[in-house]
């Protein structure tokens, strides 16, 4: 996963931060080694960016993977990243998540945290619950938000089965970033849809 190239021109308005390889590996390990939610499954990666989670799911034996992002440039890089590690079976889709339809065994996502556009993470979580039987969704860690996310999940017919606390270390991505790497505390939610 270290070889997956980051976005060459990330857009601040879309909160495009390439998920660090270590964090992606941890999420994928939890999803497959602990819960068995990737191998032989259909997987959607919402807001896939340059494809790190999608590619990881395919490498771990997902039967069918769809990576979705609104940014055509990110999808082009994702497709090249997949090819560079010998993965050709991923369907890369340029789309707003609101237009997506279908059913997947598992949805994995590192959505925008809603820093630039309030509620962006909520839209991703609602769509993931609509599409997936099991959802892995990464959110900025905030004790006050945990109750809100749990209620939102339940309102949309899901249940939080596990909460994993993690740290991500983000390299400087935009001009206003001054730290060599920034630690971000995040929560990974495992959600089961009741639909």
PLM feature segments, named:
Residues 64-69:
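Conserved SAM-binding motif I beta-strand of class I
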């Amino acid at each position: 996963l270290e070889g997956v190239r980051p976005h060459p021109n990330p857009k601040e308005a879309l909160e495009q931060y390439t998920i660090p390889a270590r964090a992606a590996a941890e999420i994928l390990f939890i999803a497959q080694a602990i819960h068995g939610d990737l191998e032989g499954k259909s997987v959607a990666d919402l807001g896939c960016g340059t494809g790190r989670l999608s590619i990881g799911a395919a490498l771990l034996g997902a039967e069918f993977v769809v990576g979705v992002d609104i940014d055509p440039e990110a999808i082009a890089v994702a497709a090249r990243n997949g090819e560079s590690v010998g993965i050709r079976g991923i369907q890369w889709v340029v789309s707003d998540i609101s237009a997506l339809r279908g059913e997947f065994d598992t949805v994995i996502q590192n959505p925008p945290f809603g820093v630039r556009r309030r509620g962006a993470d909520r839209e991703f979580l609602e769509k993931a619950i609509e599409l997936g039987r099991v959802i892995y969704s990464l959110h900025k860690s905030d004790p006050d938000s945990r109750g809100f996310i749990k209620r939102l999940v339940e309102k949309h017919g899901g249940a939080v089965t596990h909460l994993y606390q993690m740290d991500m270390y983000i390299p400087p991505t935009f001009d206003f970033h001054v730290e060599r790497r920034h630690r971000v505390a995040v929560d990974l939610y495992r959600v089961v849809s009741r639909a």
